[in-house]
Amino acid sequence: MSVALSHPRYPGLTVPAAETRPRARAARAYLVVSTLLAPLVVPTGPGQTAVLDVVNFFAIVAFAMFVVFPGRRTLRVPLVTPMVLVAIGSLIACGWAPSMSLAALALAQDVYLFAWFVVLVNLLHTRQDLRLVRVAWVWTAVLVSLGALAQLLFATGGSLGTLLGSRGVRPASTLYNPNMLADYLMMSVFVALSLAAEIRRLPLLLSLGIMGIALLATKSNGGMIAFAAGGLTWCIAMVATGPAHRRGSIFATAMLVASLGGALFWLGSEYGMGDRVFQALSEHTFVGRMEHSSQSRLRIWDQLEVAFARSPLGIGPGNSASLTMGIADRERPDSYRSKEAHSDYLAFAIERGPLGIVGLLGLLAALFAQVAVYWRASRRTSGGAPRRARLWTAAMLAVLAGSVVHSLVIEKLHFRHYWLFIALLCASALISTGRTAGDPVEAA
């Protein structure tokens, strides 16, 4: 759901084109800068602040002073209902927070990221703006990927021999850790695919190859599984939105592949075929890390389950890491503090209570609904779905599906690049239906 919080104070007043051009150029420059800086989070400042946060502070203040308060245009605020539910649940849970400072920091991050999201949605006016940001995203992702590969080569003396190994360097490039980098690259691959009808094939293939190698270098099992989920969703979406006469052959091919996969699975379970291959993968590639990672997360989640039983309304935002563990249960050799939840769903349920998890699920449902709005509007306004609309629809669904899966084992709701993407998604729905920031429309 999105609402119009304000209306133009003088709806009949025409703004001269000469006056709007500098503002449009400034808005586009800011959008590009935000895209370039979104994955640049190191070095880290106080409270995990980054360079982008300083830029955004001035941008949010300027947007409020020169756009919102003068009432020059309608302010579009998508996703307001689920975010209000999250906020109410978070405030209630603060009553049981072991650390109010951590709760206050988490709430401040919520407010800041949503304010930035609103600014982005209201600055994205046209399809050209959306394309500009996506192109900037892809080039930024290529640079980030090259940074990750440079870290790997520097640490290994120029060798790629440990790229698929179970041990070795896991580069983070300009992000906090390899798992965060994997999440960013997973999203970036599908953003790049959305431009397949708008940029040349060779640069696209090169950028996809660089990002793919960097994604492998992270050795992130969660990132790989999320990418697989997104890739499957992308294929299904492209088939479902494509020409009807091609669906039969594609469906037959898919059934053949599924049948072969089922036969191989039966042979493996019945006669043990493939056991050596799986054992080799577990011993010599990063797939073998999956068991260790799962055990570590299960210990964390067991402790959070105990905390939830004590405080069913929540333990306060950001307070998963403030719990004190016993000697036998401690998760760090040098500390009695617990670790973060490593799951958005568990974090919202345990830290923010029932309203928090309902708000999170509502947020995800609203995002999928926004994609449906975009697709229906694109088909209606274009007299049929153009290829670029199919590609962007498939990319949005793929990123959402990958994020839904990745959120099982990572907390990504405070990732700046994630909020940048959902701003693109919501702006796409508004633009496709003709409801941009300058249009005085009702709640939608």
What are these regions (language model features)?
Residues 46-49, 101-105, 175-178, 219-223, ...:
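Membrane-interface catalytic loops of GT-C/OST-like multi-pass glycosylation enzymes that act
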Residues 146, 152-155, 217, 238-289, ...:
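A membrane-periplasm/extracellular boundary helix in multi-pass inner-membrane enzymes
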Residues 91-92, 115, 131-167, 173-241, ...:
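Alpha-helical transmembrane segments of multi-pass inner-membrane proteins
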Residues 58-63, 231, 363-366, 370, ...:
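Transmembrane alpha-helices of multi-pass inner-membrane enzymes
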Residues 1-105, 125-135, 198-202, 245-252, ...:
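Transmembrane signal-anchor hairpin modules in multi-pass inner-membrane enzymes, especially those
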Residues 30-36, 141, 339, 343, ...:
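Loop-to-helix entry and N-terminal half of a specific, functionally important transmembrane alpha helix
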Residues 160, 171, 287-302, 306-352, ...:
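Long extracytoplasmic/lumenal interhelical loops at the membrane interface
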Residues 50-66, 107-116, 180-189, 228-232, ...:
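Membrane-embedded alpha-helical segments of multi-pass membrane proteins
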